[in-house]
Amino acid sequence: MGAHHTATEQSARLFADACAVIPGGVNSPVRAFNAVGGTPRFITSANGYWLTDADDNRYVDLVCSWGPMILGHAHPAVVEAVQRVAADGLSFGAPTPSETELASEIISRVAPVERLRMVNSGTEATMSAIRLARGFTGRPKIVKFSGCYHGHSDALLADAGSGVATLGLPSSPGVTGAATADTIVLPYNDVDAVEEIFEQVGDQIAAVITEASPGNMGAVPPEPGFNAALRRITEEHGALLILDEVMTGFRVSRSGWYGLDPVDGDLFTFGKVMSGGLPAAAFGGRAEVMERLAPLGPVYQAGTLSGNPVAMAAGLATLRTADDAVYAALDKNADRLAGLLTDALTDAGVTHRVQRGGNMLSVFFTAEPVGDFATARASETWRFPPFFHALLDAGVYPPPSAFEAWFVSAALDDEAFDRIAAALPGAARAAAEASRPA
């Protein structure tokens, strides 16, 4: 247990091959390991909590495909559902019963959601929700928060977290001033800033969008009452509240963050868990708002593969398998991981905070509470790469960025935690011995 896994020859070869045909060798930037250095691991299979790479190294997975795999990988119920549906056809470009089934399942869990539209990614979900909010209110401006990531559509990439934070970019080349001219970015968890901007231009604001509990600047949960304050302010000014639950939805509880902090958004966005790891997402909300979408209303949104039957089957199987025992296991496993992290880093004398957003968590190398993007960026992020690589070499796979949340699955067992516990002291020492860049 805790043996080092340093062979990366096959992953290095595959990465070189990928770089010849794919920009940067990856299809999402964080996978390239730019934030931590080294060779990105090319995964060839996964089962339960185990990942296996091209060099036959095995890792305890603490990324879970960036959240969706709450049951663990290749869960039999999900695999069987996908195989059964795939045998009847992969895509039809026509309505299917499973779209209605999954929409009904989601609506039954999140009370403010009365209607739901399927899309193919979280980016599509938030982009479409913004368009709908503008179409419904007739107003142009959107308020978002620094460090909250809502996908890579132009209007929402301003001062985002996730990969943009990893790359150290304020936005992205190719995002024009015109695209973000109506995007107002405020500090997260700052109710006064929200009040002030609504006093100034409230009659122009279509919506406030926020991650229900952010995980893209690390796990930085809302201060108690923050989301409720957003609800109050938007209602007072006739704006909509969009709660982005792409990450938290059906992970932190069977009703997502709404189950922990029941604030009635006008619109919600979902992804990740809702499709069991296949590419699908959704946005939904009040019927009055959603029925402005085509074909009922004038706000256009469409997608050739939206509501794909295989993705719908994976989502239904995941949600229906995730019973109370699964959510209890997720919370218990997050508690256990947080305790091991705290003990190891404390024993090594490393100043740190382990922060939680439900069963999502992050390690910040700072003594200060992290309540916004500024404090997240002010932490000693240079300690993270050696911490990460020590864990990776010991067969534990954490997120390859200091600005991403860690995710547990219900599949984790004593063997998994024994490996994590064996790996952490060395990783904590590596963090303690890290040198601040010149």
Swiss-Prot record:
InterPro entries: 4pyrrol_synth_GluAld_NH2Trfase (IPR004639), Aminotrans_3 (IPR005814), Aminotrans_3_PPA_site (IPR049704), PyrdxlP-dep_Trfase (IPR015424), PyrdxlP-dep_Trfase_major (IPR015421), PyrdxlP-dep_Trfase_small (IPR015422). Pathway: Porphyrin-containing compound metabolism; protoporphyrin-IX biosynthesis; 5-aminolevulinate from L-glutamyl-tRNA(Glu): step 2/2. The modification N6-(pyridoxal phosphate)lysine is found at residue 272. It comes from the Bacteria. One of its GO terms (biological process) is protoporphyrinogen IX biosynthetic process. Its cofactor is pyridoxal 5'-phosphate. Its main location: cytoplasm. GO terms for molecular function: glutamate-1-semialdehyde 2,1-aminomutase activity; pyridoxal phosphate binding; transaminase activity. Keywords: Cytoplasm, Isomerase, Porphyrin biosynthesis, Pyridoxal phosphate. It catalyses: (S)-4-amino-5-oxopentanoate = 5-aminolevulinate. Its EC number is 5.4.3.8. GO terms for cellular component: cytoplasm. The keyword Lyase does not apply. The keyword Cytoplasm applies. It is an enzyme of class 5 (isomerase). Transmembrane segments: none annotated. It is found in: Cytoplasm. HAMAP family: HemL_aminotrans_3 (MF_00375). Homodimer. Belongs to the class-III pyridoxal-phosphate-dependent aminotransferase family. HemL subfamily. This is Glutamate-1-semialdehyde 2,1-aminomutase. The lineage of its organism: Bacteria, Bacillati, Actinomycetota, Actinomycetes, Mycobacteriales.
